[in-house]
Regions:
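The N-cap/first-turn positions of alpha helices
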Residues: 197-201
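Short hydrophobic/glycine-rich mini-motifs in sensory/regulatory modules
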Residues: 133-143
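Juxtadomain coupling helices with adjacent low-complexity linkers
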Residues: 1-12, 19-20, 141, 147-187, ...
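Recognition helix of helix-turn-helix DNA-binding domains
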Residues: 210-243
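Regulatory input/activation interfaces that engage signals or partners
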Residues: 12, 27-129, 134
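Alpha-helical protein-protein interaction scaffolds
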Residues: 218, 254-256
Length: 257
């Protein structure tokens, strides 16, 4: 029996332990399916965009031009994007063009701000399919699959409909599971949860600080700093301190400064 696109994606996705690596897999899959770019937002009401552990926008790592990503945040384009607003009202995939006169927008009275957003998008792509994903707690996220040639949009959307729909849902669900694991890792009721002090010490270790330097920073003894670092390594089931830092970064517990 032939393995489908979404099955291959799910198999690879299950091995991803961070939002960053999962997002890169999404971008790779988009290209293999024939889309030029992919984008996602975990909560359509959020105006910020997710970042990598090094502070870079994940969208940039996925292949989006830096100026486009920064403009989306700085100009709060998500506040006025008509596609983002539609995601809260439907579970169906939305096929749309960046041209305000496109088929999706006929019969809709777009506000000037919405028209401006669509025209801004045209500097980077011509059309897209956006798959809304309704999440626990009433939030709605989405994955958008973009193409640079509007003439190919409808056929591309039709040919990849099942794959984009299933992959979009699998991606957001996986991020929800990673999020739950991260929350569990800092839950005081969890015996393996890192304490605030252990996270602090591990954060300084990620910045290259020695045990002696960490002890001075937290105003505790050298032995206390070592104790917290060893506890962190044990709780994260890491082989050493460097491994613990990598695990903590992948789970979003710490950020490399």
């Amino acid at each position: 029996m032939e393995i489908t696109w979404d099955e291959r994606f799910r198999e690879k996705l299950s091995a991803q332990t961070s939002l960053n690596s999962a997002a890169l897999l999404l971008a790779e899959s988009a290209a293999e399916l024939g889309w030029d770019l992919a984008a996602f937002q975990l909560d359509r009401e959020q105006l910020a965009l997710p970042r990598c552990s090094d502070g870079q926008f994940i969208g940039t790592a996925m292949g989006w031009p830096s100026d486009c990503v920064h403009a989306w945040v700085d100009r709060e384009l998500g506040r006025y994007c008509p596609v983002t607003q539609l995601c809260g009202r439907t579970a169906d995939a939305i096929v749309w063009e960046c041209d305000p006169a496109g088929v999706e927008w006929r019969g809709r009275k777009l506000a000037p701000e919405q028209t401006e957003v669509l025209r801004y998008y045209r500097g980077y792509f011509e059309g897209a399919v956006t798959v809304p994903v309704h999440r626990p707690g009433g939030k709605s996220g989405y994955v958008t699959w973009c193409i640079g040639d509007s003439g190919k949009l409808l056929r591309q959307a039709r040919d990849t409909y099942a794959a984009t729909y299933l992959i979009s849902h699998a991606f957001i669900r996986h991020i929800d599971r990673l999020d739950a694991a991260r929350r569990d890792a800092v839950n005081p009721a969890n015996p393996n949860a890192l304490t605030a002090r252990e996270i602090e010490c591990l954060s300084w270790a990620a910045c290259g600080k020695t045990e002696e330097e960490i002890a001075l920073i937290i105003r505790r003894s050298h032995e206390t700093a070592r104790f917290h670092l060893r506890n962190a390594v044990t709780k994260l089931n890491a082989s050493n301190r460097t491994h613990a830092v990598a695990i903590a970064c992948s789970r979003g517990l710490i950020t490399v400064r």
